[in-house]
Amino acid sequence: MNKTEFIAYMTEHCHNNKHAAHKTLTKADAEKALNLVIDSVISAIKSKHNVNLTGFGSFEIHHRKAREGRNPKTGAKMTIDAYNQPTFRAGRKLKEACN
């Protein structure tokens, strides 16, 4: 499911969800909400903060040290620079929903 399909799914799910505070959600509002969540997670991760959404999962940043590697084409040794790797760990509720 791509982003556009997910936004359509959000609006449909809102209309059928008995727990939703509002029974109407336009695609424009759903897109704004989704973009806000994505932008907020990215901003928090860039600021070196972990984002824990209980039951859903956590977004974290892991620092990877510089290391020596090989160019797969030539086999020549090269140094792979240190970098920060964003990671996602699924929460219990999400794991249970998948099984």
From Swiss-Prot:
Key words, A-Z: DNA condensation, DNA-binding
Disulfide bridge partners, by residue number: none
Pfam family, one: Bac_DNA_binding
GO biological process, one term: chromosome condensation
Top-level division of the source organism's lineage: Bacteria
GO molecular function, one term: DNA binding
Subunit description: Homodimer.
Family: Belongs to the bacterial histone-like protein family.
PANTHER family named in the record: DNA-BINDING PROTEIN HU, DNA-BINDING PROTEIN HU-BETA
Biological function: Histone-like DNA-binding protein which is capable of wrapping DNA to stabilize it, and thus to prevent its denaturation under extreme environmental conditions.
Name by which UniProt lists this protein: DNA-binding protein HU
